[in-house]
UniProtKB/Swiss-Prot annotation:
Gene3D superfamilies: 3.30.230.10. Belongs to the RnpA family. It catalyses: Endonucleolytic cleavage of RNA, removing 5'-extranucleotides from tRNA precursor. One of its GO terms (molecular function) is ribonuclease P activity. One of its GO terms (biological process) is tRNA 5'-leader removal. Consists of a catalytic RNA component (M1 or rnpB) and a protein subunit. It is an enzyme of class 3 (hydrolase). One of its GO terms (cellular component) is ribonuclease P complex. The keyword Ribonucleoprotein does not apply. This is Ribonuclease P protein component.
Length: 118
């Protein structure tokens, strides 16, 4: 399973427009399964965008740690065999409390939401 990141503002706007917005306690997930042509022609199956606001934490070190945790969570979730044939894109926006919650609980919450909406 191959994952790549959303590169520019245009890609983020496309996913925001085409995707379904899901509000959870620790994050907001925008997930799109009906992708435009630019994504379908790619060799990658999963497209990931992460938006960590300065409102969440002023320190860049903490914001970068949150991004690393999200990337690792997605790698774990997408490595499951049920995602092999599906192409989808998502944007994850963490909320307050995301950095304090333990990793296993985040894994459970995120995988539950993704599996329910693909």
């Amino acid at each position: 399973m191959s994952i790549t990141s959303l590169k520019n503002q245009k890609e983020f706007e496309l996913i925001n427009k085409l995707g379904k917005k899901l509000h959870e306690r620790y994050f907001i997930l925008v997930i799109a399964t009906k992708l435009p042509k630019i994504f379908l022609e790619s060799k990658y199956n999963t497209f990931l965008g992460i938006k960590v606001s300065r409102k969440l934490n002023k320190k860049a070190v903490v914001r970068n740690k949150i991004k690393r945790r999200i990337r690792h969570l997605i790698r774990i979730i997408v490595s499951d065999s049920s995602f092999k044939a599906i192409k989808f894109a998502m944007i994850i926006i963490p909320r307050k409390g995301f950095e304090e919650i333990n990793f296993s609980h985040l894994n459970y919450e995120l995988s539950k939401v993704i599996l329910r909406n693909i």
